[in-house]
Design a protein with these regions (language model features):
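A short helix-loop-beta-strand connector motif used in the catalytic cores of GNAT acetyltransferases and
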Residues: 44-54, 73-77
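Conserved beta-strand in the GNAT
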Residues: 54, 61-70
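Conserved acyl-donor/pantetheine-binding loop and adjacent beta-alpha core of acyl/acetyltransferases
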Residues: 67-111, 171
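Conserved acetyl-CoA-binding loop-helix of GNAT-fold acetyltransferases
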Residues: 115-129
């Protein structure tokens, strides 16, 4: 049985892993004919507020990845860099979210060998589950139309006040990009119940193993989502549990 390990780390703590992430992500973009993405740069690799999750196969090495970039107001989020010239309204929208703790889920990719197996959704779930560890209340993302379903599963909703109802032609004419937000990453009330349970499980037990079916193949999935392997603040867990019980009671 194949083993997939989902490993989270601060970007500055593992330069070699970041370099491999960049290499594989660019290869996937080139396969789609995309070479001019403004946000496909190396700036994030030296940002202490960028967190990375990679999917590592015991058979095939790094097969997917995703990032969470926390908005401290010192460096533009990728979504700002991508959309500001298309619609200046992205700036005040992000400023309003930053006050309570906001970050961007970005840089999602998976190798072609793992296409249509559900890996993007698994990476997105893992990324969203990090919210409590890194002090976020909201998360934003910019997704291509063909990955919209993964964002919706994770609880993202469309930022309809910018662009054409949240939609932009970016980065090439054949791709529609959608700006999205999870307004409350702690409660995750915008996520479908089945997927919300999964993300809450990863949040409450960030170090776990489970058998999941990718395509039709059972796969051993090992989650290593504790940043720095530190002891997590149990007060955050208590808050998550209370909100979970409240949500169940009112569902």
């Amino acid at each position: 049985m194949e083993t997939l390990t989902f490993k989270a780390f601060r970007a500055v703590d593992d330069p070699s892993m970041c370099a491999e992430f960049l290499k594989q992500h660019r290869k996937v973009l080139e396969d789609f004919g995309i070479t001019n993405v403004t946000t496909n740069n190396e700036d994030w690799t030296t940002d202490p507020d960028t967190y990375v999750i990679v999917a590592l196969s015991n058979n095939n090495g790094m097969v997917g990845g995703i990032r969470v970039e926390v908005d401290r107001g010192t460096r533009d989020l990728p979504i700002h860099s991508a959309l500001y010239e298309l619609d200046h309204r992205i700036a005040p929208a992000l400023t309003a979210l930053r006050e309570h703790g906001n970050g961007e889920v970005c840089g999602l990719w998976n190798s072609n060998k793992y296409a249509s197996l559900g890996l993007p959704a698994m990476l997105a779930f893992a990324a969203v589950s990090l919210g409590n560890q890194i002090g976020l209340r909201s998360m934003v993302c910019l997704v291509a139309h063909y990955t919209l379903r993964h964002a919706l599963k994770s609880g993202f909703t469309i930022l309809e006040d910018i662009g054409n109802g949240g939609t932009f032609t970016y980065p090439i004419p054949s791709i529609k990009a959608i700006a999205m937000v999870i307004p409350d990453v702690i409660a995750l009330s915008t996520a479908p119940q089945e997927h919300r349970r999964h993300m809450m499980s990863l949040r409450l037990r960030p170090e776990q193993e489970r058998i999941e079916v990718l395509g039709r193949v059972p796969t051993r999935c090992v989650y290593q989502l504790c940043i720095d392997k530190k002891v997590l603040d149990l007060r955050a867990y208590v808050e998550v549990l209370c909100m979970h019980h409240q949500h169940v009671a009112t569902a």
